[in-house]
Amino acid sequence: MPPEHIGVVITTYNSPLWLAKVLAGYEQQSHRDFTAIIADDGSGDETRAVVDRFRERGILRLEHVWQEDQGFRKCRILNRAIANTACDYLIFTDGDCIPEPNLVATHRRLAAPGYFLSGGYIKLTLPVSESLTEEEIASGIIFDRDWLIARGQPRSHKLWKLLRQPWKQNLLNRMTPAAASWNGMNSSTWTRDLVAVNGFNEDMQYGGLDRELGERLWNYGHKSRQIRFSTVCLHLDHGRGYARPEIWAKNRAIRKAVKRDRSWWASNGIVKSRAAER
């Protein structure tokens, strides 16, 4: 059976212009019965104003989960979103990723017990990212390959993800050498399974925190399905001042231990317990 109540968890931090473009994309979804959950890692009043503006438009069912700004605590706000939701199925993305119109419908259609879905994304250049208007997003033209190239996006094989023929999408999903890993821009699974592995590991910071969750889901017994050519989002460009070598090294060590020990429980997750469960 398909999920009964779908939530789309959208992380954000002080990027109101990008968030507005993303929410404009979710207003155009072909499947409308979902809740957009803004997982906000401490943004200011401008972001709250964007959320309020879209809530007042009455198209989206919006929830705003906010925490005080105390540095990069993305995993913590994601865990709060998971713990507080009534949705039985969650799609995860970021506040800089504009969804194609069938993204929610595709995740809903392909959802299956014991699986997570690994969707695709296309990174836009900064000039193209800045140029997109809410009107263009609403029209859906931004997902046309030739239109993007004319706007200034470089030609690339990655634009094949915009193919609309299902048989081509399925063929490329099977042929791609990319692993069906958990991708924080476009992945989904059942809420009960996220709770079973204790959510995201709050010891993780920027750099691989999404992959680490997927690796623990695999250890838990989950399988993953590649849908990177079936549904995509356009990733708006931005700086990454929070990426530091020492953090990457720490995160790599955590992931190495997860793989070595085949652990699935995040000791510093939704439940704050250091005793690993088996």
Task: Please provide the spans of the model-predicted regions.
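Short, acidic, metal-binding catalytic loop of nucleotide-sugar glycosyltransferases
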Residues: 24-33
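Short beta-strand/loop segment that forms part of the nucleotide-sugar
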Residues: 33-43, 63-67
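A conserved acidic beta->alpha catalytic loop
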Residues: 40-50, 97
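Glycine-rich, basic loop-to-helix element that forms the pyrophosphate-binding segment
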Residues: 68-85, 102
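Short aromatic/hydrophobic "clamp" motif used to bind/position activated sugar donors
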Residues: 90
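Conserved donor NDP-sugar-binding/catalytic core segment of glycosyltransferases
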Residues: 102-151
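Short, flexible, basic/aromatic active-site loop/helix in glycosyltransferases
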Residues: 137-179
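Acidic donor-binding loop at a coil-to-helix junction in glycosyltransferase catalytic cores
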Residues: 185, 206-213
